[in-house]
């Protein structure tokens, strides 16, 4: 299985001609953690994924993986680094003329010299991981959209990637199947300890799936950090998007103009209370992810730097044993049950 790697993005900017997509994007994805990238339509989230894997070249900035800057490295080194990535595209991106087995096996046949017997063992393992055992001979046109996404996910995992990218995995799925897919993503992170980055519009996914959340808005990264930071934030953009409200700076186009905001204020738009934070999805088997302990140490190390509401949310998630370990007091109800970190 792959083991996650830290991904450090520094000052990344991308344009198409004179049209700027985003500027000076800087954040770090800790190894093995689940990260979600949100933002209104048209903010360049999918473009960011393509820059991350080297399909598009940014005008400025750096992307560091294993001390290699993907923006400036030589083509042969970039080719090797790309093998560290697995990608689930919006529609699964399966070859319609191939059955699911051959779709999943494709990267192994293209990028390795493994024997067919080895390939079969690996493919069957990955298909079992995503719940597709018995469907190997089916064609993409014979299965549901959710199954196609799972087949695409199996293909993305087949080279044991250190970094797994998900481009709107919930696109086209109903809420129930989105919930099943989110549980699968958590379970796969537990099994692989790979670093996950998920681009999505789904608010429930953003509230329950990630360890860290980032929001792109108005050609910049508005905020990136632990889930507790964003889910308790009163920043107008972050709060509006994560709670799916009409009231706020985000309009039908990316940003409301001054007249719209003034009219909203004159109409007495009230300040909304943040809803209670939803619990993070836990592995189905009741165990923990390897990233949980690392994340807990990391977040507790920065606790004093976070706003009070985020601090309180983190403290409230700790068990009694964890409180004693970190010397924490002043939290809410103490728990010895499932952990969020």
Briefly describe each language-model feature range:
Residues 164-167:
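Catalytic Walker B motif of ABC-type/P-loop ATPase nucleotide-binding domains
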Residues 53:
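Helix-to-loop junction immediately C-terminal to a conserved catalytic motif
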Residues 139-143, 147:
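Conserved ABC ATPase signature
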Residues 68-69, 116-134:
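Conserved ABC ATPase "signature" region
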């Amino acid at each position: 299985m792959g083991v996650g790697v830290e991904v450090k993005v520094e000052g990344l900017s991308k344009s198409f001609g004179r049209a700027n997509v985003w500027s000076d994007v800087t954040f770090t994805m800790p190894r093995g953690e689940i990260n979600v990238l949100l933002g209104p339509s048209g903010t360049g989230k999918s473009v960011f994924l393509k820059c991350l894997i080297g399909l598009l070249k940014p005008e400025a900035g750096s992307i560091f993986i294993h001390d290699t800057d993907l923006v400036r490295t030589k083509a042969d080194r970039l080719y090797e680094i790309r093998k560290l990535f697995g990608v689930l595209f919006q529609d699964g991106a399966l070859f319609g003329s191939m059955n699911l087995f051959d779709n999943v096996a494709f990267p192994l046949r293209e990028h390795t010299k493994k024997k067919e017997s080895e390939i079969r063992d690996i493919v069957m393992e990955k298909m079992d991981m995503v719940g597709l055992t018995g469907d190997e001979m089916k064609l993409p046109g014979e299965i549901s959209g959710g199954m196609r996404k799972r087949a695409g996910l199996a293909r993305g995992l087949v080279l044991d990637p250190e970094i797994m990218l998900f481009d709107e995995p919930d696109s086209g799925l109903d809420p129930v199947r989105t919930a099943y897919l989110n549980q699968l993503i958590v379970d796969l992170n537990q099994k692989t300890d790979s670093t996950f980055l998920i681009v999505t519009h789904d608010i429930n996914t953003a509230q329950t799936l990630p360890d860290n959340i980032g929001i792109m808005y108005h050609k910049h990264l508005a905020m990136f950090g632990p889930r507790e930071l964003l889910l308790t934030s009163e920043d107008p953009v972050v709060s509006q998007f994560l709670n799916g409200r009409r009231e706020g700076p985000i309009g039908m186009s990316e940003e409301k103009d001054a007249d719209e905001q003034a009219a909203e204020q004159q109409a007495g738009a009230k300040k909304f209370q943040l809803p209670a934070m939803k619990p993070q999805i836990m592995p189905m088997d009741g165990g923990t992810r390897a990233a949980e302990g690392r994340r807990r140490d990391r977040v507790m190390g920065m606790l004093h730097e976070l706003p009070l509401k985020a601090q309180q949310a983190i403290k409230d998630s700790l068990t009694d044993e964890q409180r004693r370990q970190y010397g924490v007091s002043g939290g809410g109800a103490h728990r010895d049950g499932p952990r969020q970190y």
